[in-house]
Amino acid sequence: MKLFGTDGVRGKAGEFLDSFLAMRLAMAAGIYFKDKSITNNILVGKDTRRSGYMIENAIVSGLTSIGYNVIQIGPMPTPAIAFLTEDMRCDAGIMISASHNPYYDNGIKFFDAHGNKLSEDIEKKIEEIYFDDKLIQASKVDMEKIGQAKRIDDVIGRYIVSIKNSFPKDLTLKSLRVVLDVAHGAAYKVAPTVFKELGAEVIVMSDKPNGLNINENCGALHPANLAAEVKRLRADVGFAFDGDADRLVVVDEKGEVANGDSLLGVLALYLKEQGKLQSSVVATIMSNGALKEFLNKHGIELDTCNVGDKYVLEKLKANGGNFGGEQSGHIIFSDYAKTGDGLIAALQFSALMLSKKKSASSILGQVKPYPQLLTNLKIAEKKDLDKIKGLKELKKDLENKNINTLFRYSGTENLIRLLLEARDIKLLEKEMKNVVEFFKKALNG
């Protein structure tokens, strides 16, 4: 049984991800981290889901049972956990969140002592420990060695300072009217505080979490309400975050929702113009062809990697780069953060607007993405794509029609993601029907 998906362990809270799994997974991770332990402390944070209480208590129980001390910091963005794990010199960090998923899902993400997401090799080792009953039992400590847990409520200030330090000292947000949609999620306190302290006029939406409304018709996956509000209030820009604030969606002053690749492109160019861009930009295999064309036109190389911000970061490290991201809104400025951080990306885009003295729409309009269609098809089984009869011929036929393709399985669900890209939207719509029918027959028998 495989526990880890593309971004930690994730599933329906109380069913797949119940308190038993959370406790045992925490024990397994703790056993792994013990080998390199320095402080014997592990940091635990969460988003605003009600199930976070259940999972947090289970994780604390598991870690303390093997002798670890636990620092609980409550609702906090995922990138804050990455930063604070290193800043507070913990052996590891744990974030309880299902990111952009509905409230009934939850997840567990791990960070090493340096605030990095774990490699697949380390995740595999933790899985092996999880299923090793003898090792789990043998790792329980005597009563006098059981760890302690303490809750700290004032660490938010450390993260706010680090975020503000990413914003240019010679700029101020005083001239900007900004609408923030915090998705009833982990950034509901932090995001408004940062923008207000830097001088912006701030209007906040979806900032009243009740444990069940996270991401519900709001945030990065549902920016329509934000778009309407930006237009109604004649704001300069709108920023939508997801439940754990590791991704960003931008809405311009006209109420248009920006394409994630357009955002990547203009931010990369901004870094280059400042002399701060190192090596090539990294995006995922789902990036729009227009992004590569835009970057190449400005003398910037683009490398691609698998979907997932941890793979973007791995590629950046390998290339010696410092900027990359995903079309979905995970944007990594590795000079400032170890993972995608929606707040940092929002501040950098604000700085770009201010330094250029241009509107959001005129900046984002520099990159004109090609039409793409994405279909998430539910399937009965995940067959090896290389062994599906007729698939090679289908891809060749689409290629001959100047259609780019990407077919890949979801890492967490029984889905195949079907992506087509071309300059002709009508052609895409026609061919997508054929592609869907092909995979229905191939994977649903």
From Swiss-Prot:
The keyword Zinc does not apply. It catalyses: alpha-D-glucosamine 1-phosphate = D-glucosamine 6-phosphate. One of its GO terms (biological process) is peptidoglycan biosynthetic process. Disulfide bonds: none annotated. One of its GO terms (molecular function) is magnesium ion binding. InterPro entries: A-D-PHexomutase_a/b/a-I, A-D-PHexomutase_a/b/a-I/II/III, A-D-PHexomutase_a/b/a-II, A-D-PHexomutase_a/b/a-III, A-D-PHexomutase_C, A-D-PHexomutase_C_sf, A-D-PHexomutase_CS, Alpha-D-phosphohexomutase_SF. The keyword Isomerase applies. Mg(2+) binds at residues 99, 242, 244, 246. Keywords: Isomerase, Magnesium, Metal-binding, Phosphoprotein. Transmembrane segments: none annotated. It is an enzyme of class 5 (isomerase). Its EC number is 5.4.2.10. This is Phosphoglucosamine mutase. The gene is glmM.
